Amino acid sequence: MAKWTELQDKSFLEATARERAVGIVDEGTFTEFCGPFDKIYSPHLPLMGEAIEYDDGLVAGVGKIGKKPIFVISQEGRFIGGSIGEVSGAKMVKTIQLASDLYEEMVSEKPDLPEEMRPAVVISFETGGVRLHEANAGLLAHAEVMDQIQNCRGRVPIISLIGSRVGCFGGMGFVAAATDVIIMSQFGRLGLTGPEVIEQEMGKDEFDASDRALVYRTTGGKHKYIIGDCNYLAADSIRSFRETTTAVLQKPMEEIETFRRIGSMEKIKEQIELVKLSVSLKPKDSMDVWAHAGNENPESLINMTLDEFLAQAKRLKA
């Protein structure tokens, strides 16, 4: 692996799960849990004649950003599409639980715990969701992760990073939506049903998964930023994701809580208004939504640089 300083300028899109995990925290602070040398792999895959990975396609560990303990979860899309099975799911669950337990321990020792020391969880998503090979074990893992995220609400901030090749789809799309903050790059993709699955089930006339422009207009970072599914857009480098994460974590927990998409009656009302808008607007393309948000020439936003886009793009208000 490259040195930490070299990792900072590496493309987030191209980086491996381990590179993202190491690079997002301060230099030399990352300690991995259940790494490859521990050889904890899926018990289901060998029974089906499938290849295994000794980390089950997920890197988990802890590091620091300043004085703040950062529990990191990073998915590897190069292994079965970053899918979540029994072992990788258990690693996610336990890592979040460790962050929660540490927070409780720190507060018991120091009730007025400074914000700069509050533990946080950072999840770098690269996944198509549940690992179909492991069926209910993978589904159960999703439920247990969601349970831990809810347990952390108002106590331990959980930040999603989405900018890797596979994107974040399937059940993990629900998981990302349940976290406090979502940071994406323009190359990140977020959704529930992936483009290929939509085409397979509904036909190419309904959604052409080979049309990359269409895919990014529908699930990409710029679209998600305009409609409010994504809180922040970062450049395509580990450094940019790290800097954006650091900036978010400098905010008090009460403010971070306001960035959520779900979890309160107010948020439910906002979502209902968006559903009403989609019914009345009847958009044929994301460009219709961008225009409704106040972007007079929405097509011009597509090829803008990140800085230009952030300066000019108007976001949707329900």
Swiss-Prot record:
InterPro entries in UniProt: AcCoA_carboxyl_beta, ClpP/crotonase-like_dom_sf, COA_CT_N, Malonate_beta
EC number(s) stated in the UniProt entry for this protein: 2.1.3.10
Gene Ontology CC terms, in alphabetical order: cytoplasm
Enzyme class, spelled out: transferase
Alphabetical UniProt keywords: Cytoplasm, Transferase
Pfam families attached to this UniProt entry: Carboxyl_trans
An example Gene Ontology molecular-function term: transferase activity
GO biological process, one term: carbohydrate metabolic process
Positions of the CoA carboxyltransferase N-terminal domain: 2-257
Reaction equations catalysed: N(6)-biotinyl-L-lysyl-[protein] + malonyl-[ACP] = N(6)-carboxybiotinyl-L-lysyl-[protein] + acetyl-[ACP]
Subcellular location: Cytoplasm
PANTHER family with a match to the protein in the record: ACETYL-COENZYME A CARBOXYLASE CARBOXYL TRANSFERASE SUBUNIT BETA, CHLOROPLASTIC, MALONATE DECARBOXYLASE BETA SUBUNIT
Function: Gamma subunit of the biotin-dependent malonate decarboxylase multienzyme complex (EC 7.2.4.4). The two subunits MADC and MADD are required for the transfer of the malonate carboxy group from the acyl-carrier protein (ACP) to the prosthetic group of the biotin carrier MADF. Required for the regeneration of ACP.
NCBIfam families (UniProt xref): malonate_beta, PRK07189.1
Protein name: Malonyl-S-ACP:biotin-protein carboxyltransferase MADC
